[in-house]
Amino acid sequence: MFPGGKIDPRKLQRLMREMGMEQEPISGVERVEIHLKDGSKLVFEKPQVIRMKIMNQEFYQVAGKAKREKPEEEPFTDEDVKLVAEQAGVSEEEARKALEETGGDLAEAIMRLQGE
């Protein structure tokens, strides 16, 4: 497309504007996370991010090294939630919250809920 593979950046910017394309770097980005269907996520620390507008649609280009993080598993099951709710005489929602706060410790969650 371009002889010698080189092009003046100013010419490229002008050409992009003529085609209805805009691009703008976004500064100060600390972290970008892309959450995947399987519960894992791609995490970019201190990436370079560019917002591009092409024909009234916005696109974001993220450049940097991605790290894949596996989904965090709860340290307790739905059966644990039911047991705590039953033993403490509270709703399953309250039981789940107590289990989250205690890191899945059933006895501690029950004692906290009964102490309230």
From Swiss-Prot:
Main function: Contacts the emerging nascent chain on the ribosome.
Example GO biological process: protein transport
Assembly information from the UniProt record: Homodimer. Interacts with the ribosome. Binds ribosomal RNA.
High-level lineage: Archaea, Methanobacteriati, Methanobacteriota, Methanomada group, Methanopyri
This protein's name: Nascent polypeptide-associated complex protein
PROSITE patterns (UniProt xref): NAC_AB (PS51151)
Protein family: Belongs to the NAC-alpha family.
Keyword tags: Protein transport, RNA-binding, Transport
Domain NAC-A/B per the UniProt entry, residue ranges: 6-75
CDD domains: NAC_NACA, UBA_AeNAC
Family matches, as InterPro entries: NAC-like_UBA (IPR044034), NAC_A/B_dom_sf (IPR038187), NAC_arc (IPR005231), Nas_poly-pep-assoc_cplx_dom (IPR002715), UBA-like_sf (IPR009060)
Xref: HAMAP family: NAC_arch
NCBIfam families xref list: archaeal-type nascent polypeptide-associated complex protein (TIGR00264)
